[in-house]
Amino acid sequence: MATGAGAGAATVVSAFTGLKSTAQFPSSFKMSNAAAEWEQKTTSNGGRVRCMQVWPPFGNPKFETLSYLPTLTEEQLVKEVEYLLRNKWVPCLEFDLEGSISRKYNRSPGYYDGRYWVMWKLPMFGCTEASQVINEVRECAKAYPKAFIRVIGFDNVRQVQCISFIVHKPE
């Protein structure tokens, strides 16, 4: 369940109620045999399912993996970084003042639309301990307290980004 912390208020999502049986509808709403046969041959769009709701995006931005969860504790952050290192990924820190995609000067996507964050120092090649990454996060947060900071794990063999999560949000 989401908890409200910040500008957006949390909304409670109702429990899954499932599909309703047509037995409770009046006979005028019941399908003819032809309609029932057609329904059996086609897929349902789930129109009677009431559990699907949209996360309210206004004043409640979400950023990366794990961003729907509460802020990571120090212990949870260490576990995530250890997972990253255990998979032999190279940790890298990035920071940005906005933390989300924003297009100020043009409608089409491009380099300056907020997708690319500023890299904090160099990727941490040869990093073997989570404490090294945590110390860099602290140092970056001290230098840029009003910035969003994320940790990225790169696989330098496949040359892809494998994990990315926010580790610091501005107050």
Curated annotation (Swiss-Prot):
The protein's name: Ribulose bisphosphate carboxylase small subunit, chloroplastic
Entries under InterPro entries matching the protein: RuBisCO_ssu, RuBisCO_ssu_dom, RuBisCO_ssu_sf
Molecular function as annotated in GO: ribulose-bisphosphate carboxylase activity
Encoding gene, per UniProt annotation: RBCS
Organism: Pinus thunbergii (Japanese black pine)
GO terms, biological process: photorespiration; reductive pentose-phosphate cycle
Entry-linked SMART domains: RuBisCO_small (SM00961)
Further remark: The basic functional RuBisCO is composed of a large chain homodimer in a 'head-to-tail' conformation. In form I RuBisCO this homodimer is arranged in a barrel-like tetramer with the small subunits forming a tetrameric 'cap' on each end of the 'barrel'.
Classification via PANTHER family: RIBULOSE BISPHOSPHATE CARBOXYLASE SMALL CHAIN 1, CHLOROPLASTIC (PTHR31262), RIBULOSE BISPHOSPHATE CARBOXYLASE SMALL SUBUNIT 1A, CHLOROPLASTIC-RELATED (PTHR31262:SF10)
Entry superkingdom: Eukaryota
